[in-house]
Regions:
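Residue-level structural signal for beta-strand termini and adjacent loop
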Residues: 79, 99-101
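Hydrophobic packing residues in well-ordered alpha-helices of helical domains and bundles
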Residues: 67, 107-110
């Protein structure tokens, strides 16, 4: 709390995967290079020097999936259906206009990145990182 200015607000997307790297940073512990971390330290965000997330966020729970990268979010309510939606969160924060049809290449790149992320998470869950 002594390092965070009262009333600080941010539009940077964060997630629970950021907790561990943030705690490590706050207590001054460095992770070995051979141990991947999915999240980022939020300390620069608290200190006002982080204006955008340096890496995308992936989600996969109960058959739903999302990939958040910068202003864009790809979302699929049923992963097995492969019916992804695409939103520009800066222009459309309430996700009313699905841009999948007119930004197909952008959507394909994001879905491919999500698939690689998911494979990495599954490998890690089986002990692949350790």
């Amino acid at each position: 709390p002594a390092r965070i200015k009262s009333g600080t607000r941010s539009e940077v997307a964060t997630c629970t995967v950021d907790y561990f790297p943030t705690i490590l940073d706050l207590v001054g512990i460095e992770m070995p290079d051979d141990r991947p971390l999915d999240g980022i330290s939020l300390v620069p965000l608290f200190e006002g020097s982080l204006e955008s997330r340096p890496s995308p966020l992936g989600f996969h729970i109960r058959g739903q999936a999302a990939w958040h990268d910068g202003d864009w979010k790809a979302y699929c309510s049923k992963v097995n259906s492969h019916e992804w939606e695409l939103y520009n969160l800066k222009d459309d924060p309430h996700e009313k206009k699905n841009r999948a049809a007119d930004k197909l290449l952008k959507l394909e790149v994001m879905v491919e990145a999500w698939e690689k992320w998911k494979a990495s998470v599954e490998a890690s869950d089986k002990g692949g990182d350790y």
